[in-house]
Structure formats: structure tokens, C-alpha cells
Design a protein with these regions (language model features):
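N-terminal alpha-helical interaction modules that lie
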Residues: 1-56, 61-96, 102-105, 109-111, ...
Length: 126
């Protein structure tokens, strides 16, 4: 826990916006998602292997996982990578991470997917 105080504004808790992912990564992911249906998961996994910090890629891997456990694992990795990214961008454990900011979609998609898959496997701690 930080010894630094959290500064509140008249607008409420601070808002954190993740940086936009590199255009090359977004292009590679778009190409992978446009592959024939039987190849999408493998192509997305290749993007994740090349860019393991990409929250959009982890979200896509979770979205295209072969089963609930594979989806859960991908979303969980993306969620934890997202927490690291949020902290690196000033988030201190509280405040807004809004869907309205497109660059937050990878993290928030992983969070949503993690919640859904955790529920499906009876993981109540999530």
C-alpha cells in the first residue's frame, strides 16, 4: 500500500486511462480475427506469443478459447497484466477505469470474461 494520499477531485475518484496499444499489434490481431474460423484461435495465440503484454490479445484469446478452463486462464492472465498496466499508469487500487475509454477495453474485457468463466467453474473467490 502506498503512503501517498489519494487526491480526490470534485468529479470524484481519479480516472485511469490505459495507453492505446501499438498499431502493429492491433493490425496483427485484426488479421488473426479475420482468419477462417477454424484458424482464429491459433492465430490469436500467435499474436499473444509475440506480444504477451497486449491486453487486447489476451482478451481475444479468452474469447476464442477451446473450453471454459482455457478461456478462464487467458482472461486471468489478461486481468493480471491489466492490473500491472493500470498501476504503471497511475492507478492506485481505486478510481475509475471506464469502458468509454477505448484503450481500456482489453483490460475490462478480460475482467468481464474472468468473472463469467470463474462463475461457470464455481470459482467464487473471483
Amino acid at each position: 500500500m502506498s503512503d501517498q494520499p489519494i487526491h480526490l477531485t470534485p468529479q470524484g475518484p481519479p480516472r485511469t486511462v490505459l495507453p492505446v496499444e501499438d498499431a502493429t499489434i492491433r493490425h496483427e490481431l485484426q488479421q488473426a480475427l479475420g482468419a477462417p474460423a477454424e484458424d482464429v484461435r491459433a492465430r490469436v495465440a500467435e499474436v499473444v506469443a509475440r506480444h504477451p503484454r497486449s491486453l487486447l490479445a489476451w482478451r481475444a484469446l479468452g474469447d476464442h478459447g477451446r473450453d471454459t478452463m482455457e478461456r478462464y486462464a487467458a482472461y486471468r492472465v489478461g486481468y493480471h497484466r491489466g492490473l500491472d498496466a493500470l498501476r504503471a499508469n497511475g492507478w492506485r487500487g481505486s478510481g475509475y477505469v471506464r469502458w468509454a475509454d477505448e484503450s481500456n477495453h482489453g483490460f475490462l474485457g478480460c475482467l468481464r470474461g474472468l468473472g463469467e468463466t470463474a462463475s461457470a467453474i464455481g470459482e467464487t473467490d473471483e
